[in-house]
Amino acid sequence: MAKTYDAGVKEYRETYWMPEYTPLDTDILACFKVTPQPGVPREEVAAAVAAESSTGTWTTVWTDLLTDLDHYKGRAYAIEDVPGDDTCFYAFIAYPIDLFEEGSVVNVMTSLVGNVFGFKALRALRLEDIRFPIAYVMTCNGPPQGIQVERDLLNKYGRPLLGCTIKPKLGLSAKNYGRACYEGLRGGLDFTKDDENVNSQPFMRWRHRFDFVMEAIQKAEAETGERKGHYLNVTAPTSDEMMKRAEYAKEIGAPIIMHDYITGGWSANTQLAQWCQDNGMLLHIHRAMHAVLDRNPHHGIHFRVLTKILRLSGGDHLHSGTVVGKLEGDREATLGWIDIMRDSFNKEDRSRGIFFDQDWGSMPGVLPVASGGIHVWHMPALVNIFGDDSVLQFGGGTLGHPWGNAAGAAANRVAVEACVEARNNGRELEKEGKEILTTAAAHSPELKAAMETWKEIKFEFDTVDKLDVSHK
């Protein structure tokens, strides 16, 4: 019997609330934390989120009869309480894969975090997690090189990589900037880095910076016999200008470039990642602006979602927080998104904030980057938390050394190697860290001076965005 059109407004839950639905392996699944307006039933507001983020609108429309609405609509299929917070609840929604353009995280996010976030029936809405089916993962390019290829390119194995963000982040001339890079690389760092807001300002145009930095890299490589790199930030006002800067970095022999993937845009990032893969370049990703989206525990996008988006869009490094430094980061939640960056399969684990199984197939992993207010005293905890497949990035913790940049780099190199050796010998880094560092400092005056300089520096503030579940 043909369907008939009934004009008017009906409740969302009549069409989009389907607790009997069993998600398909090909569905994209989303978990939202929903804070409804007072008096709005949970089922109605969950269905409204499903409708407004897929095929629905505020009224019935006759053009629904021209398509197979049952095939394309999003389905709210489950509701759960949020532990310890009765003002909100979790809504689980399944989206047919055919709703989304292949390989386009932009298209996925435009639907899932689009107009629905301004819906009046909601007081707040947060996208907590997404499950991308393997059928969709395979349409995405992913990291340009991946962890193993990067280690092979650099010929560095068995320890975390060491980096340093050049400070002051703004105001240095290109020549002095290159000098700071050289001193850090010569002292023992693997990488130095542009800060996220270093682009092409009047005090240091991008081409001048690239040239002086490459001179620093080549000189440090010749003196140390090690492969070195600097994250040259190619973020630009337009994607054409971004690609121009990337091409020049390749031309002068740079092994790695950098992009601010949120402020620069996901379309630009995907384009750049594909170019890096084609041209044998590594891609470092900064997450500038993430806290605007992810820090409010009731509204926005959780960082684990932004992590998944980056892995699909493409990047070889991603800033991940430190747990122990100056920036926000719950330990278990951080471990959860580190797993999302690196592992080929993530099992649902609510104790780490992971709501769905996630199969990445053969897609390479991303190196987590610990950066923000860290110094040598944090090294045992960082090595224990992040393991070998990571980048430990000390800006002030290198350049603030009382003897200068090279000494700061040497102190960090001695500290990381001492911690790795101690771990490999079965010692407990976070319990025995002070003894491990003190023993190493007996043979390293640079490390001893660093330990004395930062012995009282701590960042003991409570985390704003905590996991909603108890750690098991």
Swiss-Prot record:
Its cofactor is:
Mg(2+)
- Enumerate the InterPro entries for this protein: RuBisCO, RuBisCo_large_chain_AS, RuBisCO_lsu_C, RuBisCO_lsu_C_sf, RuBisCO_lsu_fd_N, RuBisCO_lsu_N_sf, RuBisCO_lsuI
> Which NCBIfam families does the record associate with it?
PRK04208.1
Keywords per UniProt: Calvin cycle, Carbon dioxide fixation, Lyase, Magnesium, Metal-binding, Monooxygenase, Oxidoreductase
> Which positions in this protein are listed as binding substrate?
115, 165, 169, 287, 319, 371
Q: Does this entry carry the keyword Lyase?
A: yes
Protein name as it appears in the record: Ribulose bisphosphate carboxylase large chain
- The superkingdom of the source organism is Bacteria
* More details: The basic functional RuBisCO is composed of a large chain homodimer in a 'head-to-tail' conformation. In form I RuBisCO this homodimer is arranged in a barrel-like tetramer with the small subunits forming a tetrameric 'cap' on each end of the 'barrel'.
Q: Which residues carry this modification: N6-carboxylysine?
A: 193
Q: Where does the record place the site Transition state stabilizer? A: 326
Q: Which family does it belong to?
A: Belongs to the RuBisCO large chain family. Type I subfamily.
Function of the protein: RuBisCO catalyzes two reactions: the carboxylation of D-ribulose 1,5-bisphosphate, the primary event in carbon dioxide fixation, as well as the oxidative fragmentation of the pentose substrate. Both reactions occur simultaneously and in competition at the same active site.
Which residues are noted in the entry as Mg(2+)-binding?
A: 193, 195-196
Q: What class of enzyme is it?
A: lyase
The active site lies at 167, 286
What's the record's note on cofactor binding? Binds 1 Mg(2+) ion per subunit.
Q: Which GO terms describe its molecular function?
A: magnesium ion binding; monooxygenase activity; ribulose-bisphosphate carboxylase activity
Lineage, uppermost ranks: Bacteria, Pseudomonadati, Pseudomonadota, Gammaproteobacteria, sulfur-oxidizing symbionts
Keyword Lyase in the entry? The reply is yes
Q: List, in alphabetical order, the GO biological process terms annotated in this UniProt record.
A: reductive pentose-phosphate cycle
| Substrates-to-products reaction catalysed | 2 (2R)-3-phosphoglycerate + 2 H(+) = D-ribulose 1,5-bisphosphate + CO2 + H2O; D-ribulose 1,5-bisphosphate + O2 = 2-phosphoglycolate + (2R)-3-phosphoglycerate + 2 H(+)
Cite the EC number: 4.1.1.39
Q: Which organism is it from?
A: Solemya velum gill symbiont
Record note on quaternary structure: Heterohexadecamer of 8 large chains and 8 small chains.
